């Protein structure tokens, strides 16, 4: 960890236990665990959501759900986050953590290509986080 990362880490709130557990399980089970957003990025996403106060959020690229859980923590009651993951093998892992989180009721997990799923969701999204295949 370089000096800037250490500084940011020291000033950030501690990682939530559930997110820490998800980080650990992702590193043990996922093929490419480096794709996980992680603690600092998660805190940044939560802060951005709190500042923007969106009612509808779209995330493209769920992976194991860390960023979705982080953003959901920043959502106000009644707001919703739709997250789209193309890899159906990650569905059970991500959903299990959404189900255990106090913010999980704000999250709707969709499995499939974002090119197909996003238009079917309809409506307007106040915030979109693209963390999936950027080439498409």
Q: What positions do the PLM features span?
A:
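S-adenosylmethionine/decaboxylated-SAM
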Residues: 38-136
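Conserved SAM-binding loop and adjacent beta-strand
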Residues: 12-16, 30-43, 50
């Amino acid at each position: 960890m370089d000096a800037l990362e250490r500084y940011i880490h020291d000033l950030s709130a501690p990682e939530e236990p559930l997110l820490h557990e998800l980080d650990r399980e992702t590193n043990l089970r996922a093929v490419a665990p480096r794709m996980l957003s992680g603690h600092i990025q998660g805190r940044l996403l939560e802060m951005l959501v709190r500042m923007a106060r969106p009612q509808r959020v779209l995330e493209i690229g769920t992976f194991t759900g860390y960023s979705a859980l982080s953003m959901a923590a920043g959502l106000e009651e009644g707001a919703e986050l739709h997250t789209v993951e193309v890899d159906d093998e990650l569905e059970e892992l991500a959903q299990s953590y959404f189900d255990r989180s106090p913010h999980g009721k704000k999250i709707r997990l969709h499995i499939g290509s974002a090119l197909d799923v996003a238009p079917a969701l309809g409506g307007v999204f106040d915030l979109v986080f693209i963390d999936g295949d950027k080439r498409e």
